[in-house]
Amino acid sequence: MSASTQVTERIPHRPPFLFIDEIVSETPDGLVARRTWRAEESFYQGHYPGAPITPGVLLCEAVFQAGALYLARAAADAPGGRGVPLLVKIGDARFRSPVYPGDTVTIEVKKRDLTAGFFAMSGTMKRGDTRILSVEFSVAWKAPEASP
């Protein structure tokens, strides 16, 4: 499964560094997305040969991209909504279970607070009922700079 147009129209990420396949649902305060980790992805060749596990940093990135999708919707409704998401803070990341090639995960992000243009968010990743990851993070939305 490749990323839906719904995803690629909102955020600038593209394969091979796009880790959201589809948006499942949205609310005013959050978003739920889905991702299937495909065995043919090149990072599995080195992490780890013969015993592939999805790198934790990529699991976090998938959560951050879900946060970017949420913010892109909010920015689209604001004046001058074009821009890119910038991750500004990561805190309290906890990994509880590994993710293997072929696993499909659900990612949920929720807005916790908005202060001075920074969105504080929480994110979780699950495989079925098994919690894989929880992380707190903050994102800013950067408008494009004028060209000289």
Map each language-model feature to its residues.
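Catalytic strand-loop segment that frames the active site of acyl-thioester-processing enzymes
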Residues: P15-T54, L59
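Hydrophobic beta-strand-centered segment that forms part of the acyl-chain substrate-binding groove
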Residues: M1, A66-T106, I132-S134, V139
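A residue-level detector for short acidic-glycine micro-motifs
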Residues: E22-S25, D92, S97, K111-D113
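Short aromatic-glycine motifs in intrinsically disordered, low-complexity regions
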Residues: S2-R14, G80-R82
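Beta-strand-rich interaction surfaces with strong enrichment in secreted/lumenal proteins
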Residues: T8, G50, F95-S97
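Short amphipathic alpha-helical face segments that pack within enzyme cores
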Residues: L58-A66
